[in-house]
C-alpha cells in the first residue's frame, strides 16, 4: 500500500479501513507500507503494517506512510542513473510476492497505477484529491475537508472586509476544476464565484463590485 501526490485529510482513515478490514478477514495476511509514494515501491523502501499501526490515527491529517510528488516520467527508458523505474517497481512487486497493490492518490497517481496495471500487476486504487475531479466517483475523500476549511476562511475574512469596507479576492486550490470554489463560495456567501469551467466578463464583475460600494 502507498500514498502518492499531495496530502489531505482522510488518507490515514482510508488506510486504516483497508488494514483493519484485511486483518479482520485473515490472520496470515501480510501488509507492506511503501514509504513516500512510488519512490518506496521503486527503491523497495517499506515496512510491515499491522492494525496496531493505525490505532488512534483516525482523525489525524496527512499520511503516516509519507508521500511524494517526485516528477519522474514512467517511460520504458532508463533515467540518468540507468534505472528503469517501471521495471524497478515490477521487480519489487514480484520479489515480495504481492497479490495486489493498494494505491491512494489523485489523477497523476491513477495514471501511474493504470500503467502498472497494463504491465500485469494487480492494482486497486482509492480516489484521493481535494479537487474532486476523478472520474467514476461522486466525491473523493479530501474534498469535503477542503471545502470546510475554505468556507471557514471566507467566514473569518468577512469580519475584516466589513470592518474596513474592503473587497477581498480569495483564490482556492482545485487544479483545473471549480468544485471547491463553488461549494465554498456558496457556503461562505461570496458575491461573485469564478469557475474555470465558465467563461466570465471582467466588466460584469466590475459592475457587481461597483454596486456594492
Q: Residue ranges of each PLM-predicted region?
A:
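Short glycine-rich or small-residue beta-strand-to-loop segments that form or flank ligand, phosphate
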Residues: 1-8, 64-66, 99-103, 168-171
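N-terminal phosphate-binding or glycine-rich loops at protein starts, especially the Walker A/P-loop
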Residues: 1-45
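Glycine-rich oxoanion-binding loops at beta->alpha junctions
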Residues: 43-101, 141-148, 152
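Short, ordered loop/turn segments at secondary-structure junctions
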Residues: 4-6, 34-39, 69-70, 106-109, ...
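Accessory alpha-helical/coil subdomains and C-terminal extensions
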Residues: 92-94, 100-105, 111-115, 122, ...
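Acidic/polar active-site rim loop that often engages polyanionic ligands
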Residues: 126-139, 162-163, 187-188
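Short acidic, glycine/serine/threonine-rich loops at helix termini
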Residues: 11-14, 42-47, 76-77, 112-117, ...
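A glycine- and small-aliphatic-rich helix-loop capping segment at beta-alpha/alpha-beta transitions
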Residues: 16-25, 48-53, 115-125, 141-145, ...
Amino acid at each position: 500500500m502507498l500514498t502518492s501526490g499531495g496530502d489531505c485529510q482522510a488518507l490515514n482513515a482510508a488506510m486504516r479501513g483497508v488494514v483493519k478490514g484485511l486483518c479482520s478477514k485473515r490472520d496470515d495476511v501480510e501488509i507492506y507500507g511503501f514509504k513516500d509514494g512510488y519512490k518506496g515501491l521503486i527503491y523497495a523502501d517499506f515496512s510491515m503494517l499491522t492494525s496496531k499501526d493505525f490505532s488512534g490515527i483516525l482523525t489525524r491529517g496527512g499520511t503516516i506512510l509519507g508521500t511524494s510528488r517526485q516528477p519522474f516520467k514512467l517511460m520504458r527508458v532508463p533515467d540518468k542513473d540507468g534505472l528503469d523505474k517501471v521495471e524497478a517497481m515490477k521487480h519489487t512487486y514480484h520479489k515480495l510476492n504481492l497479490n495486489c497493490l493498494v494505491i491512494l492518490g489523485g489523477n497523476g497517481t491513477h495514471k501511474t497505477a493504470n500503467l502498472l496495471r497494463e504491465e500485469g500487476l494487480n492494482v486497486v486504487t482509492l480516489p484521493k484529491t481535494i479537487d474532486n475531479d476523478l472520474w467514476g466517483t461522486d466525491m473523493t475523500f479530501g474534498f469535503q475537508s477542503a471545502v470546510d476549511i475554505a468556507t471557514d476562511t471566507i467566514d473569518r475574512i468577512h469580519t475584516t472586509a466589513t470592518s474596513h469596507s474592503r473587497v477581498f479576492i480569495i483564490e482556492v486550490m482545485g487544479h483545473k476544476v471549480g468544485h471547491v470554489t463553488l461549494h465554498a463560495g456558496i457556503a461562505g456567501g461570496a458575491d461573485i464565484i469564478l469557475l474555470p469551467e465558465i467563461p466570465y466578463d471582467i466588466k460584469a464583475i466590475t459592475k457587481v463590485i461597483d454596486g456594492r460600494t
